[in-house]
């Protein structure tokens, strides 16, 4: 048969899915089973000793989950993938497979707050240290390397600051040191960028977000390029015999598939963060329409950004698609279709209220956009990261992550653009008392909050003063005892 390379949209629909041989079902079936029947005793023994590939138990592999893994690996240009129960689980099994006690990771400080905590708290408790690098200069990452560093980790488009990583520069630094470049591509998806083409070795996604796209199902995935030399001496756990599998070597026996085999046969086996078949099916439905949804997300986001930039109530907009953004040229090169639809902005302070207070009033007044801790939904979502997703970080970590106290994150959805802008406009007017042009059209709800707090404070001060005065008067009127009375 003639060879043909299928396009992205075709693979989003078909990769990893073949008609069911037994019943002819065209959609990927849901294999809702814990385990799979062996042909005979030898078949079972060979599967358990990794002498053949097949399904044993759904904690390790499942046909529905495998379809999702193959589809996303195809879209990313990787050799394979391992799916997990969440994006955080995908990160954890990757770090756990790469590192052991005494090892080290160099990571961007511009990461999702949960990732920072996993690296800075949980992994540190296991004896794995992380150095966080502010900014995107590869030279700074190189300076942070130690002899025990096992990976460089970054998000392509940072959540929520919007910085764009220098992938090619970071890949050069990582490969010179003999370690992999691991990237989180959740915000961009393979539709906007395929990091492996720019030097990344391992790509992680929270499939919960744009790949799934509907805010219904959790999932994560790890995709491998198949290009990294795991036998370079820096990863003994990849080359030394594995006792639990009768001395096989991940690199020696499985070659380019060694790391993925380690993830599946060791990390999923021991830690168990497996994706359920039902969840895999749900996420597959989202992947099928990824290109069409991303086109619509981008179109809406660009119009929202343009509107916010012109709004006199807005202090700043962090969006690498803007020409004055410091990473605009890099974004144009790496993400020619666009940088996505998740970005951040700040609301100006009023005469009485801080930007943070005004932002809180703005979020509370939204009628269409949802205030919740997710991104990449079909619906428009907003959040104040400083008090939610990043609230566990120190002031220094927040500053290094580009998360100001007034910063608001928005994930622009698929609603009619007129409705999205109407909602933002009416909420800003409610919070500030100003219209789009900065003209006074009413009272500011944020100022009212400040005035109410001032009134309460004044009343409390008056009450305290009155109490103090009464106490002083009572003290003066107390009877005294004379010397004669004594």
For the regions a language model picked out, list residue spans one by one.
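PLP-dependent enzyme catalytic core of the Aspartate aminotransferase-like
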Residues: 120, 147, 349-353, 380-486
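Conserved N-terminal alpha-helix of the aminotransferase class I/II PLP-enzyme fold
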Residues: 35, 40-92, 114-121
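Short loop segments at secondary-structure junctions
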Residues: 35, 225-228, 347-352
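Short, solvent-exposed beta-strand edge segments and adjacent coil->beta transition regions
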Residues: 103, 338-342, 405-409
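Conserved PLP-enzyme active-site core in the AAT-like
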Residues: 2-4, 9-21, 81-311, 318, ...
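Conserved small-domain helix->loop->beta segment predominantly found in fold-type I
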Residues: 271-274, 279-280, 285, 289, ...
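Short hydrophobic/aromatic beta-strand micro-patches
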Residues: 223, 344-346, 411-413
């Amino acid at each position: 048969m003639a060879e043909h390379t299928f396009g992205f949209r075709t693979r989003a629909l078909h990769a990893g899915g073949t008609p069911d041989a037994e019943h002819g079902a065209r959609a990927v079936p849901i294999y809702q089973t814990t385990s799979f029947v062996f042909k005979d005793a030898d078949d079972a023994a060979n599967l358990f000793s990794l002498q053949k590939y097949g399904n044993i138990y759904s904690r390790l592999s499942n046909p529905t989950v495998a379809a999702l893994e193959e589809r996303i690996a195809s879209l990313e240009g990787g050799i394979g993938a391992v799916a997990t129960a969440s994006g955080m689980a995908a990160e954890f099994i990757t770090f756990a497979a790469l590192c052991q006690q005494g090892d080290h990771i160099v990571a961007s400080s511009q990461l999702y707050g949960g990732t920072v905590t996993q690296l800075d708290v949980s992994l540190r408790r296991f004896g794995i240290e992380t150095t966080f690098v502010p900014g995107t200069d590869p030279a700074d990452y190189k300076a942070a390397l130690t002899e025990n560093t096992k990976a460089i980790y970054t998000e392509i488009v940072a959540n929520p600051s919007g910085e764009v990583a220098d992938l090619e520069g970071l890949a050069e630094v990582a490969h010179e040191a003999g370690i992999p470049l691991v990237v989180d591509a959740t915000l961009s998806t393979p539709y906007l960028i395929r990091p492996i083409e720019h030097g990344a070795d391992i790509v992680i996604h929270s499939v919960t977000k744009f790949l799934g796209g509907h805010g219904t199902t959790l999932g994560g995935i790890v995709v491998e390029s198949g290009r990294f030399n795991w036998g370079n001496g820096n990863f003994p756990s990849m080359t030394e015999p594995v006792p639990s599998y009768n001395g096989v070597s991940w690199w020696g026996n499985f070659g380019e598939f060694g790391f993925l085999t380690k993830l599946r046969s060791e990390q999923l086996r021991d830690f168990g963060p497996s994706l359920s078949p039902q969840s895999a099916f749900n996420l597959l439905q989202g992947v099928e329409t990824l290109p069409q949804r991303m086109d619509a997300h981008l179109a809406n986001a660009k119009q929202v950004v343009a509107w916010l930039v012109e709004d006199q109530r807005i202090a700043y907009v962090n969006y690498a698609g803007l020409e004055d953004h410091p990473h605009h040229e890099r974004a144009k090169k790496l993400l020619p279709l666009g940088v996505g639809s998740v970005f951040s902005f700040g609301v100006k302070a009023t005469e009485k209220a801080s930007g943070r207070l005004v932002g809180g009033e703005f979020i509370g007044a939204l009628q269409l956009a949802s205030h919740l801790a997710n991104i990449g939904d079909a619906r428009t979502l907003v959040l104040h990261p400083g008090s939610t997703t990043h609230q566990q970080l120190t002031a220094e970590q927040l500053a290094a992550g580009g998360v100001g106290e007034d910063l608001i994150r928005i994930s622009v959805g698929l609603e009619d653009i007129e409705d999205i802008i109407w909602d933002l406009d009416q909420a800003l007017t409610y919070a500030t008392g100003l219209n789009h042009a900065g003209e006074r059209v009413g009272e500011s709800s944020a100022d009212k909050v400040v005035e109410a707090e001032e009134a309460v404070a004044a009343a409390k001060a008056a009450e305290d003063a009155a109490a103090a005065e009464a106490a002083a008067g009572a003290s003066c009127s107390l009877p005294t005892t004379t010397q004669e009375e004594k």
